[in-house]
Every structure is written in C-alpha cells, then in structure tokens.
UniProtKB/Swiss-Prot annotation:
Function description: Catalyzes the attachment of serine to tRNA(Ser). Is also able to aminoacylate tRNA(Sec) with serine, to form the misacylated tRNA L-seryl-tRNA(Sec), which will be further converted into selenocysteinyl-tRNA(Sec).
Enzyme class: ligase
Subunit structure as annotated in this protein's UniProt entry: Homodimer. The tRNA molecule binds across the dimer.
Full protein name: Serine--tRNA ligase
UniProt gene name: serS
Organism: Vibrio cholerae serotype O1 (strain ATCC 39315 / El Tor Inaba N16961)
Residues forming coiled coils: none
Amino acid sequence: MLDSKLLRTELDETAAKLARRGFKLDVETIRTLEEQRKSIQVEVENLQSTRNSISKQIGQLMASGDKAGAEAVKQQIGTLGDDLDAKKVELDAVMAQLDAITQTVPNIPDDAVPNGKDDSENVEVSRWGTPKTYDFEVKDHVDLGEMGDGLDFASATKITGARFVVMKGQFARLHRAIAQFMLDLHTDQHGYTELYVPYLVNAETLFGTGQLPKFGQDLFHTEPLTEKASDEEPRRLSLIPTAEVPVTNLVRDTILDEAELPLKMTAHTPCFRSEAGSYGRDTRGLIRMHQFDKVELVQITRPEDSMAALEELTGHAEKVLQLLELPYRKVILCTGDMGFGSCKTYDLEVWVPAQKTYREISSCSNMWDFQARRMQARFRRKGEKKPELVHTLNGSGLAVGRTMVAILENYQEADGRIAIPAVLQKYMGGLTHIG
C-alpha cells in the first residue's frame, strides 16, 4: 500500500499521479476523514494531558490529609477516562475508514512508465528472433496435441470442467522438462535459491502481496474467506494464483540485515485462477487455464537497487526464451495496463504462429515498497538503528503451459511431429521429436 503520509501531506499530487493509471482517488472523502482524524487526535491528546496533570494532584491532596479532595479528583479522572475511551473509539473508527480506502489504492506508476488506457498503448522496447515461415499449413497447439494423443481437454472437462487439461505421455514429459530446464537455469546460472512452498495460503498472506481485499473474486477458496478463524474453526485458505504470493511473504514481519540483500528466490508451482473477468476469452487450448504451472522469480532488494534488479530479472526471463530459440518481443506496460501493486512492468510476448501474433508469456514487475509496507518487510543498514522497507520484485520465468504452446507451434513439422529444442533434449531422455 501507499505511504499514508502521501495521503496526508501530498494528497492532490498523489491523486494526479494515480490519475495517470485511470484511478480516481476520492480526495474529498480522504480530506474530510483526515480533518476528522486530526481534530479527534487533538482531543485525545488534550484529554490525556488533562488526566495526567490532574492525577498528580491526588498524591498532594493525600499528603495534606484532604481525602475528600483526593476522592473528588479520582472521580474526575474516571470521567476523563470514560471521555478518553470514547474519543479513542471515534479515532479508531476514522482510522479504519482511512485504512479501508488506502488498501484499495494501487501503486503510483514510475515516471518512466508511458501513459495509456489499456494494452493497445503498451510500448514495444525490443524484439529477439525472427518468426519462422512454413511451407505447410500451420496447426495450433490444440490440434497438434490431439494428433499426438498428448493433450486431452475432453477428459479434463469431464473430471473437473472447462479450462483444464490432461497431458499424456511425451507431452506430459515435455511439460515437466520445460519446468526443470527453467529451474536449472535460474539456480545454476542466475543465482536464485529454489524453494518448495505451500499451494494454500491464508488471508494475511494474500493481503501482503495485494490480492486482498480487492481481488478475492479472482481466487479459489477452500471456504468462504474471513480475515481470521477461531481456534475451533477450520482455517480458511486460498489456492495460490502465483508463487509470488507465498515466496514474497517469506519476508513478512521480518527485519533483514543489509548484507542479506538481495534475496533471489525461485519456485515452480501450479497456479490457480478463477479468471472471473475473462469469460469468452481464449477458451481454446492452454493459453488461459484455471490451473497452470509457472516458474516464478522473486527478488528482495534495497530501495536504490530495485530498478536495476528489474532489468536483471527481466533479462533472466528473456534468457529462457533465447535458449529455447523462441521469437519474442519485450514491451513496457502503459499506466492503464499495469497490475495493482506494480510501479513498472515489462511483459515478454512470445510468437504464436497459429495466431500470427505475440502473446504474453512473462510479466516482470518492480513493486517498489508497496508490498513491503503491507507485509512490514524491512531491512537494517549497517550502522543504522532504524529499519527501512525493502523493495520487492517478481516475474514469470516462465509460464510453463504458454512456453509449451510456443514450442509446439514454433517447432512443428509438416508431418505433425514436434522437434524438441536442443536445450530440452537431455531432459527428454535424448528424444529429438514427439508426436
């Protein structure tokens, strides 16, 4: 979340920055609540001061033998205490309203982020590789998978419903090989520590990375979600939409030593998304699933290092595509297409021959101190006493299913077989083709 000081001292400037991303900050409500907060805070402080001052009289009156006077002062203190408690309740109510607003306010875009309404106004930064030309009719990954008896959408629909898949044989092996290759690359060459994390998380964790309270409808929940459960009730949990959620929350309520930074972590997990706002979009194939695998990259850095870390992390995701020899382009998201907690995001879009277009395969974001403030994730500089908020970054390195789509379509041959990229062949037992 944003620093509350910005909403107190730079309200109009903050509203203008948020307007760049199409978010209308309720300035008047915040200003009214802030005035109420200040007024009640003054009353609370005055009541506390008065009570403390009067309390000193009790000892003096008792010492002089004036028990009646001392008793009268005690009654006065009791009345002041009741008034003080009532004002504190008022103050808590106003603060709760301010917190509720703050929790739904997105991050401020970095100055380098281009203005725009939606993904049509994202700006291309670079391209790598040249899309192949084919002397036969290109098939999409669904047809290729069904021809090779490797992608079974009908059985998945019977078992669960739409937007799921059963993978079989060498197609399932290819899916596994892709994830193994990515993990080996990121751990062996890019310096990430591999993690195995829970796939179910609690509400506090989802709040920390920004999914709650605003985006609960995008998740799958084990039970109706509540902020806390009593000891007698089962814990309400949610399936993770991305490994970013559990991995980033490892530093929640933690003060790190400066020497520990940067932290670089990676995890391969399934991801679960309801796709609540995607009805009718990408209904065919693996592009948009309720359950899909992803290798996630997370970095925790000092504030002054985070923008350089974004370039590094994005480069690590790009390296996967380059080694797989898949054509892609890199775009910087405009203000209207950025995620809720991001201050700057690059998308990597891979070439999908059957669609004759580039499709997102990775999104790499600098969250600045937005998540860290929600999580109270901090570090202490050498020689300093006061801790500071860390910066958090995350990115897909890559989405496994979409990488498989790109391989199936870009490496297809005229007879319907799929050539295996050279870097994956050792993970496939030396196979050069499937299908």
